């Protein structure tokens, strides 16, 4: 993650963490606010979002109910972001993106060392987006190198052409291409267990 490499840990703590104001639920809690996440995501593809809203306006003027409905459905979900706790966000920046604990073999969860090489009977599928500008290609592929004792025939790496970060999890290509591959993979190895 380029941003995590370019900035010191203290920058994230002082610039990205804010206190929830009164009278909101969670008042005084320290969080990485959803609105900051949203701004960060949208600024990566500013021109595309501006164009989408121009199209939305034109669909409204033209009475194109389908275009309006698709836009609203997409943005209702896209704009639904939650605050992340200070602890979760800062630990992720520090231990995952800056210090690379998992590939270095020093990542702990609930005081237990995580050992990916101990995984032997679980199939592994990773999915990445060709155009993902948040989690670049290779970030989840690394799991294949870390899980050394999963047989090769139980591993699948899928790079989805033509999608960015959001498209890996949602949208037409997710529904028509990624999700069916995931289900096929899950069912294949679920049947082998029985």
Kindly give the residue locations of the regions a language model identified:
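Alpha/beta-hydrolase-fold enzymes
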Residues: 1-87
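Active-site nucleophile elbow and catalytic-triad environment of alpha/beta-hydrolase enzymes
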Residues: 97-116
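Short, conserved loop/helix-junction motifs that constitute active-site signature segments
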Residues: 116-121, 147-152
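Short beta-strand/loop motif that positions the catalytic acidic residue
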Residues: 119-120, 125-128, 132
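Conserved alpha/beta-hydrolase "acid-adjacent" motif
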Residues: 133-142
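Catalytic histidine-centered segment of alpha/beta-hydrolase-like enzymes
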Residues: 134, 158-177
